[in-house]
Amino acid sequence: MNATRKQRLWLVIGVLAAAALAVTLIVFALQRNMSYLFTPSQVRAGEAAGYQQFRLGGMVKAGSIQRAGDSLKVSFIVIDKNAATQVEYTGILPDLFRDNQSVIANGRMQGGRFVANEVLAKHDETYMPKELKDAMAQGHLGKPVPATVAPLTAPR
């Protein structure tokens, strides 16, 4: 093997090693930032037990919203057809947050309750994220969830 071929071989090996290192770092970064969505039924079944941080999706139970008088702390219950999970959140809730509305809370389980660091409310009366609709449909024993299609309109 002459010197030019040897130099090219080391260059190719170096480029491949750098690419492998970059891919490995990207995969680890994406895994740390992934947030899985679970319904209250899945949480109760223990499917979320291995996740430190995850999203909880469902409906806000009517009459369950309790606000602390001296702080921004709010407590409410997220339900699906088969289970309920107590949620605590400290912060300003979205304007569309209310009873019987679809909600997604990002946070972690702590002492049997879900402590949220972010709460998202659905943005209109017909929208439900596909992953939440699919997850809730699995919890509806024998009852299909109706399609939720909202017409797209261009901003004016």
From Swiss-Prot:
GO terms for biological process: cytochrome complex assembly. The keyword Transmembrane helix applies. Residues 1-8 are cytoplasmic. GO terms for molecular function: heme binding; metal ion binding. Its main location: membrane. GO terms for cellular component: plasma membrane. Heme binds at H123, Y127. The chain crosses the membrane at residues 9-29. Coiled coil: none annotated. It holds the Pfam family CcmE. Gene3D superfamilies: Nucleic acid-binding proteins (2.40.50.140). It is a single-pass type II membrane protein. Keywords: Cell inner membrane, Cell membrane, Cytochrome c-type biogenesis, Heme, Iron, Membrane, Metal-binding, Signal-anchor, Transmembrane, Transmembrane helix. It is found in: Cell inner membrane. Residues 30-156 are periplasmic. Belongs to the CcmE/CycJ family. Heme chaperone required for the biogenesis of c-type cytochromes. Transiently binds heme delivered by CcmC and transfers the heme to apo-cytochromes in a process facilitated by CcmF and CcmH. This is Cytochrome c-type biogenesis protein CcmE 1.
